[in-house]
Every structure is written in structure tokens, then in C-alpha cells.
């Protein structure tokens, strides 16, 4: 599937974009560690390209999957053809994760893979809290919620504090990725563009300021890693919290 996903890319961008398929082994690790989706529907929140949905479908072929994303335009237009290429059946719903168009208790289980960080960029800390609250609302009693992101575990604890959840598992996994400077510099340019788009800022000056700040921060981290490690790992480690709704 990686070859299909990157078929129109030049050799360097093929490496960068190919990370979305599997995330350096993290998606395979996550689905192996997650409990099987409950009977009924499983919701993947902020599903983006739908690569995690594909891994869920491969790992749990009988699961009834639904992916929700704020848009399926631009890069995310590949979500539907990607699922077809993967041989995975899933319904895709375009909606804001902070205001999900589902009745209470619709889903038996839910997940969010690296989606909270994008929601934070666009809608701040409050947007993340609203998303987790909505996930709880649409999750049935006894349903399982799996959250995966780069945040420290303490930040997950703060997000879940006060909610009727019992934590079942915590885990951490680094990306099996080692990039040289040429790949890293191309990646940083692409990631900066993506970050600016996620802010949804209409003001051109604000966009340019964000671009300069984010590119500078990412470049500094790249230089640090190249000096200390000799290679660049663009993200991670990814941390996972799995919790069950207790009422």
C-alpha cells in the first residue's frame, strides 16, 4: 500500500510521505496491543488519510468501522481510495470531532491516532477537551477508548481527569525511522505547511509568522538530533492510553 500511496512522489518525498503508512511500525504495534473492537461499531476520530482505519481493518477484519474527519478534501481526499486499495470496508463521515453527529452511546469502541495534536493546533486545548468529551458521549457503557499521540502520559491524565473511565493500559513506542539531512529538510518543509494549514488562520501575516516559528523549531530539533544521533526521527515516541467507560 505504501508504494500505491507514494506512486507520484519523487524519491525523497516518497520516503517522507511513506511514513503515513504504518508510522514506522507504530500503527502495527498499537493495533496488536489494543483490545479487539467491541461488538457494534468502532469509531476512529480525526482519521485523516484513514491509514489507522486500514490497520484496524487488517487486524480486526470483522470489525464494523467508521472514520470521522473534519474534511476529506486536499490530501485527505485519498482516504476513500486508500481504504479500497487496502481492502478494508469503513464508512467515512465528514464532521467536526468537537460536535459529532451521532446519538449518545452509538459506538462500542473508539480510537484517535495522532488526531488530538491536530485538533490542538486548530482549536487549542479546549478543542481537545471537547473532542474527548464527545468521544465519551458517543461511546456506550463499557466501551473502550484508545488515544494515541505524542503527548506525555500526564497530559492524557489531565484530559481524562473527572471522566467516567478506568484506564486499562498505557504504552509507548518510538518510530522505526532514521532519516538523513536531505530527507529531514524536505520533511520539515512539508510538515510546516501542514501545521499552518491546521491552524485554519485566515490572516496571511499570522500564517507567515506561524510558518517561521514552526519551521525554526523543527529545524533546531533536526540539528540537535543530527548532531547527537547522526540521524533524524521526525516524531515520537507515540504514547497510548486505553480506558474503559464505566457508566
Regions found by a protein language model. Give the residues of each.
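Conserved beta-strand signature within the Rossmann-like core of class I S-adenosyl-L-methionine
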Residues: 142-149
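Conserved alpha-helix/loop element of class I SAM-dependent methyltransferases that forms part
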Residues: 20-39, 55
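Class I SAM-dependent methyltransferase Rossmann-like catalytic core
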Residues: 1-25
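A short acidic, Gly/Pro-enriched loop at the edge of an enzyme's catalytic core
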Residues: 98-110
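Conserved Class I S-adenosyl-L-methionine
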Residues: 173-247
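Class I SAM-dependent methyltransferase SAM/SAH-binding core
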Residues: 49-99
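A short glycine-rich, Lys/Arg-flanked "PGG" loop and its adjoining helix->strand segment in the class I
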Residues: 126-141
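Conserved class I S-adenosyl-L-methionine
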Residues: 38-48
